[in-house]
A protein has these predicted regions:
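Catalytic core of nucleotide-sugar-dependent glycosyltransferases
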Residues: 205-214, 218-249, 263-276
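N-proximal low-complexity "stem/linker" segments adjacent to membrane-targeting elements
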Residues: 1-27
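Membrane-interface aromatic/basic loop that binds lipid-linked glycans or pyrophosphate carriers
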Residues: 28, 44, 258-317
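Conserved nucleotide-sugar donor-binding catalytic segment
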Residues: 139-225
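Glycine-rich, basic loop-to-helix element that forms the pyrophosphate-binding segment
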Residues: 63-80
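Short aromatic/hydrophobic "clamp" motif used to bind/position activated sugar donors
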Residues: 85
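Flexible acidic/His/Gly-enriched loops in nucleotide-sugar-dependent glycosyltransferase catalytic domains
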Residues: 71, 99-170
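A conserved acidic beta->alpha catalytic loop
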Residues: 25, 32, 40-49, 65, ...
């Protein structure tokens, strides 16, 4: 019989007000965790004072120097005493039944190492959205779930660290990778998915809130660009099926290149996808949409193409 103790790990960086909001959401859980561990990434006297006053039962750990989210999470896990690990970033929140429902699903799972996640609310300056639109199929691998789209609609798949419940034992094999500038959660998930007995368990309930209103605040992760992500993908090609590999190149990394307005990405990504991947129709279409955005297609033509493509390609399943 599986144990049911949960350790919550919260990495933080110089934003005590947001951290207290996150800790309040943990304190409101219908299934209280065994312990809450806050890992302060570098100097943080103000954070220590705020947490000790508002949540005195929280375990406070501190890294001597700023080391990034991967090191902070790993340090928290290494000091955890629970049999399950849940992560919460300091600027995010949980809804009250998050731990209750995810732990119940984990204990029922047939996988040796179930990775449990659910829908979440994404709060942006443009409004609120629910993601992901679909969970993984029972036999769908991690890489193909993330990068082999079944529709053109945004938000079809989504994975986020604050929305996870993971067996503590799995971290004995796969930790977060220090030095990973971005996609640290996805990098971990892809590597964890290679461990025999690992599987994704998806809950359709909405259980977490990802707050993205303030893009100028300091973050633990740091900056990045599409070239960094391209190097990451090519260095870790063994983690992808050929179709998933073309998906990460033509859709996900191309999306970052569009945000940077860097046209050089077009040839680089297409060449790699054609030579080492297996692009499907939806990936090709989304890549073309990215090209139109990069090279300045008239907005009317751009929107017309997106509408026509949505009409003639599969909807969500």
């Amino acid at each position: 019989m599986r144990e049911s103790t949960v350790s919550v790990v919260v990495p933080t960086l110089n934003r005590p007000a947001m951290l207290l909001r996150a800790l309040d959401s943990i304190a409101s859980q219908t299934c209280p965790p065994y312990e809450v561990i806050v890992v302060v990434d570098g100097p943080g006297d103000e954070t220590f004072r705020a947490v000790r006053q508002a949540h005195p039962s929280v375990r406070l750990l501190q890294l001597k120097t700023r080391s990034g989210s991967a090191v902070a999470r790993n340090h928290g896990v290494q000091n955890a005493r629970g049999s399950w690990i849940a992560f919460l970033d300091d600027d995010d929140e949980w809804l009250p039944r998050k731990l209750e429902l995810q732990l119940s699903a984990a204990l029922r799972s047939s996988f040796r190492y179930p990775i449990v996640f659910s829908r979440l609310i994404v709060k942006t300056p443009r409004g609120e959205f629910l993601m992901p639109r679909r969970g993984p199929g029972r036999q769908e691998s991690v890489d193909e779930y993330l990068y082999c789209r079944k529709s053109l609609r945004p938000g079809e798949v989504f994975f986020y660290t604050s929305n996870l419940l993971v067996p503590r034992e799995l971290f004995n094999t796969v930790e977060f990778r220090p030095g990973q500038k971005k996609w640290n959660d996805v990098d971990w998930l892809l590597r964890a998915g290679q461990v025999p007995g690992t599987g994704l368990e998806f809950l359709p309930q909405t259980l977490s809130v990802w707050n993205t209103e303030d893009f100028n605040r300091p973050t633990i992760t740091g900056d990045y660009d599409w070239q960094y992500l391209f190097q990451w993908a090519t260095s870790n090609r063994q983690l992808f099926s050929p179709r998933a590999y073309s998906g990460v190149l033509l859709v996900s990394i191309m999306h970052e290149a569009v945000k940077q307005r860097d046209r050089r990405a077009t040839h680089v990504l297409l060449h790699e996808a054609l030579h080492r991947g297996e692009p499907d129709t939806i990936q090709a279409v989304l890549f073309i949409v990215g090209i139109l955005a990069l090279f300045g297609a008239p907005r009317g033509a751009y929107q017309w193409l997106k509408l026509r493509l949505r009409t003639h390609l599969p909807a969500d399943t």
